[in-house]
């Protein structure tokens, strides 16, 4: 679950094991842009960033004069030429499709990405649930299962 600013509000254990960018409290766009580890995990890093920036642009439109959003956009524009260029292209909307990740423990994963928007309710405007899933029976599904077992608490 993420805010309109792409701050991670909650994540299940497998999401957290999949990427440090999904840790609660983390801004996953900032992490993708600025942490070198993101380039190792996202095989097509530019596509992963472009998808997140297009999603942010859509979410920014939900409250156009939001000072926190404007601060985030200014911060990312200053810190990342790639963000600045992608933002200037003005693509809007979360992109569905397959994302290729490379995890250091389980290898390559091809995950379908989806998004569910929380209906407009006070204090939740722009909150959304990100869903990454593997095709049933695929190598990616087996890799996710292995990751789940590796990240499960002992006991």
Regions found by a protein language model. Give the residues of each.
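Hydrophobic protein-protein interaction segments
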Residues: 1-155
């Amino acid at each position: 679950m993420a805010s309109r600013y792409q701050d991670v509000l909650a994540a299940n254990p497998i999401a957290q094991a999949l990427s440090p960018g999904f840790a609660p409290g983390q801004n996953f766009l900032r992490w993708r842009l600025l942490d070198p580890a993101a380039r190792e995990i996202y095989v097509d890093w530019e596509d992963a960033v472009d998808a997140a920036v297009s999603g942010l642009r859509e979410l920014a439109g939900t409250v156009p004069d939001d000072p926190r959003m404007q601060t985030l956009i200014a911060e990312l524009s200053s810190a990342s030429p790639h963000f600045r260029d992608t933002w200037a292209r003005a693509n809007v909307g979360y992109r569905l499709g397959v994302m290729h990740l490379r995890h250091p423990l389980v290898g390559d994963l091809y995950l379908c990405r989806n998004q569910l928007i929380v209906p407009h309710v006070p204090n939740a405007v722009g909150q959304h649930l990100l869903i990454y899933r593997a095709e049933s029976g695929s190598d990616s599904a087996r890799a996710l299962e292995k990751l789940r077992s590796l990240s499960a608490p002992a006991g």
